[in-house]
C-alpha cells in the first residue's frame, strides 16, 4: 500500500496490507441505492494498515506515499479536476459519492484527496502567509500557531496517506464549517460509516485530534472499524489506542 513508511510500526502495517488487500467482511445492514458489487471488497477491508494514525504525534516522512493511487472519476470531483486516493480508498470514495448523488445530494463532490509532502509544505506556507497578512501585528510564531489549528505541517497530514478526502458542495466551494449546513452533512454523519468512512475531525474533539472541526473531511478505515467508531462516538485517536 505504501512505498516508504518512516516508522517501524507503520512499516509493519503496510506489510500487512500488501500481504492481504482483499475485502474480508460483510457489508452492513444498509439499503444501498447503488449497485455495490464493484465496491464490496474495497469497503470491507479489515487490514490494520487502513487504520494508520497520522497526526502531530505520529508523523510520516517526505517519501511516505501510497504504493497504488487511483483517480476519482472526474464526474465526481470539483470542476472535473484530477483527485487521487489510495486505490482501495478511491473505490470506497466513489461508492460514497455515487450514493450521495443517488439520494439526491447531487451537489456534493470530492475536492481533495492525496497530497504529497511537498504539496503540503506549499499549502502550509500559503496559510502562514495569509495569517501574516491578516494579522500584521502578530509574530511569525503566533501566525504559525494559528495555522496549526486548521492545517497540518508536511509529514503530519493524513492526506499524505491517500486515505482521506475533502468533500465540497458545488453551490459553495469554500471549505469551511458552513458545509455542516448542507442537508448532505446530516446524511454523511449517519451513513458515512456504511462506506468505510469516518468524520475525522468532529466538533468538540479538538483536544483529542489536534485540529479544529472539519465537517468536510472524511477518512477511510473500512466498514468494520468505521462502524465501531461511529457507534462508540469516538475519534480515530481513541480507537487505535
Q: Where are the model-predicted features located?
A:
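Sec-dependent N-terminal signal peptides of Gram-positive bacterial secreted proteins and lipoproteins
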Residues: 2-26
Amino acid at each position: 500500500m505504501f512505498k516508504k513508511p518512516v516508522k517501524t510500526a507503520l512499516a509493519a502495517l503496510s506489510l500487512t496490507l500488501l500481504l492481504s488487500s482483499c475485502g474480508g467482511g460483510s457489508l452492513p445492514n444498509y439499503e444501498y441505492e447503488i449497485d455495490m458489487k464493484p465496491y464490496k471488497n474495497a469497503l470491507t477491508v479489515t487490514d490494520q494498515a487502513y487504520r494508520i494514525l497520522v497526526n502531530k504525534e505520529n508523523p510520516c516522512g517526505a517519501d511516505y506515499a501510497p504504493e497504488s493511487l487511483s483517480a476519482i472519476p472526474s464526474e465526481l470531483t470539483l470542476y472535473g479536476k484530477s483527485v487521487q486516493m489510495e486505490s482501495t480508498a478511491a473505490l470506497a470514495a466513489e461508492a460514497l459519492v455515487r450514493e450521495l448523488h443517488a439520494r439526491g445530494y447531487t451537489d456534493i463532490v470530492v475536492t481533495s484527496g492525496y497530497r504529497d509532502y511537498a504539496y503540503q509544505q506549499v499549502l502550509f506556507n500559503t496559510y502562514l502567509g495569509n495569517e501574516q497578512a491578516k494579522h500584521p501585528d502578530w509574530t511569525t510564531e503566533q501566525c504559525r500557531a494559528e495555522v496549526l489549528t486548521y492545517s497540518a505541517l508536511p509529514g503530519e497530514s493524513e492526506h499524505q496517506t491517500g486515505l482521506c478526502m475533502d468533500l465540497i458542495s458545488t453551490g459553495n466551494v469554500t471549505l469551511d464549517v458552513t458545509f455542516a449546513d448542507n442537508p448532505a452533512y446530516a446524511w454523511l454523519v449517519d451513513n458515512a460509516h456504511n462506506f468505510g468512512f469516518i468524520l475525522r475531525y468532529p466538533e468538540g474533539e479538538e483536544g483529542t485530534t489536534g485540529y479544529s472541526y472539519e465537517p468536510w473531511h472524511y477518512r477511510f478505515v473500512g466498514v468494520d472499524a468505521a462502524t465501531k467508531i461511529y457507534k462508540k462516538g469516538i475519534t480515530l485517536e481513541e480507537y487505535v489506542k
